[in-house]
Amino acid sequence: MKKILVPILAIVLMGCQEKENVNNDTAQQQTIAALLEYTVVNKIFQDVGNNGGDAVLSSESSASGKSSVKSEVDGPTITVEPFDLTSFPKTITVDYGTGVLCQDGITRKGIVTIVSTGWYRSVGSKHTATFDNYYHENFKVEGTHVVENLGLNQDNNLEYGVTIADGKVTAPTGVAVYYSENTTRTWIAGSDTPLNIWDDEYLLNGNQSGVSAAGVEYSLTVEEALHFILLPRGIESGILDVDIADLNDVKINFTNNTITIFGQIYPFSS
């Protein structure tokens, strides 16, 4: 998303300069920085959700084995306690140690702990992830990430409620960005290959909000479901409404690659 928003931000700045009541240059720069920070933080927490679900699915697959520890040459060590198919809640520990270069080219380190009340496909199951000195590349991740299985929708696709509370991402420079989320993810492709997250596609609806490193508040509301693909990572379609500082009702349309600012429509390239 960051590659998409970079040209968008240039348009935002241009649009801001056309308004008489716009903030000064410093405020404009802080607004742009806040949006750029959002793209990084959002990507990190979406990644947490994807990999957390993968860890729970992998744990279920291996629960009939004889070892509670799963080690991979190119992945983390996953520990499941209690290690059986029926006892819940389970604590699933995903340990990246001092650093693992994963299949998607991202280096992760530290520990993600997931407490699951049932298996990932079980309706009503909740999966609560917390972090112990966990890093996505050089960004430290904190907060509580909860996924709840809401069951099948009318199209027979699984829906999951996602809540992120007290989300915090600290950059290598020491500055921190705060983030929260209340969304619904609909699993529309890849559910028949549960051990391979890279063919997954999902629709995202709901709200996200946060505070930038400079204290700029922002909120984003999905107007039309965002269609995410994981490999190559991107947004295929959907409409996102953005309110940030004094810049309100910006619409980013990923379906036709346009952005609306102050009623003016501009194209962008994805």
Give the role of each language-model region.
Residues 2-7:
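Sec-dependent signal peptide recognition
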Residues 12-15:
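C-terminal motif of bacterial Sec signal peptides marking the signal peptidase cleavage site
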Residues 17-270:
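Low-complexity, intrinsically disordered segments exposed to solvent
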